[in-house]
């Protein structure tokens, strides 16, 4: 089947919130999950005094003030290669919790605050726990500046909450040139 035709056929079967935007032939040993070189996630927070129904299910509603500049500075502590044991779901069966985060930042556009995280791989709930830790810093239940110590501790109880799934988006999957 030609790639272009396969892509059109896929899109007739996919739900409206998912679209195939490209398609190409790959070698037989290619695996969509295990052949990827990295991923980029975005966690969206609607930071406004009043809930916006158009963002329901697409972003976490957070009515308390957020200092995106402060959160961005804290998020930079996630950059690099670390043991992310403190930022994974308790009981996770992954043997090697070491991951490399090569992009991490917080931006604001109006009422929308976004955490963007890209890395070579992610543990279960890792991005949601990173987002929850930053939000807990904003409300004072996790000390500002404590991310390096939390990483070093490898202790899940030292990190913040697991932010709700509603704000999380897998934005891009990176593959090596085939």
Where are the regions that the model predicts?
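Structured-RNA-binding interfaces characteristic of tRNA pseudouridine synthases
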Residues: 1-178
């Amino acid at each position: 089947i030609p790639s272009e035709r396969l892509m059109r056929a896929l899109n007739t079967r996919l739900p409206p919130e998912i679209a195939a935007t490209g398609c190409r032939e790959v070698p037989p040993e290619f695996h969509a999950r295990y052949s990827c070189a990295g991923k980029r996630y975005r966690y969206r927070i609607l930071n406004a005094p009043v809930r916006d129904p158009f963002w329901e299910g697409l972003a976490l509603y957070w009515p308390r003030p957020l200092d995106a500049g402060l959160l961005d500075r804290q998020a930079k502590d996630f950059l690099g290669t670390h043991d992310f044991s403190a930022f994974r779901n308790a009981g996770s069966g992954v043997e090697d919790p070491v991951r490399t985060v090569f992009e991490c930042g917080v931006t604001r556009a109006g009422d929308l605050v976004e955490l963007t995280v890209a890395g070579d791989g992610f543990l279960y709930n890792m991005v949601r726990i990173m987002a929850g830790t930053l939000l807990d810093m904003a409300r004072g239940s996790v000390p500002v500046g404590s991310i390096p110590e939390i990483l070093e501790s490898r202790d899940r109880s030292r990190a913040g909450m697991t932010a709700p799934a509603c704000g999380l988006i897998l934005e891009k999957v990176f593959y090596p040139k085939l």
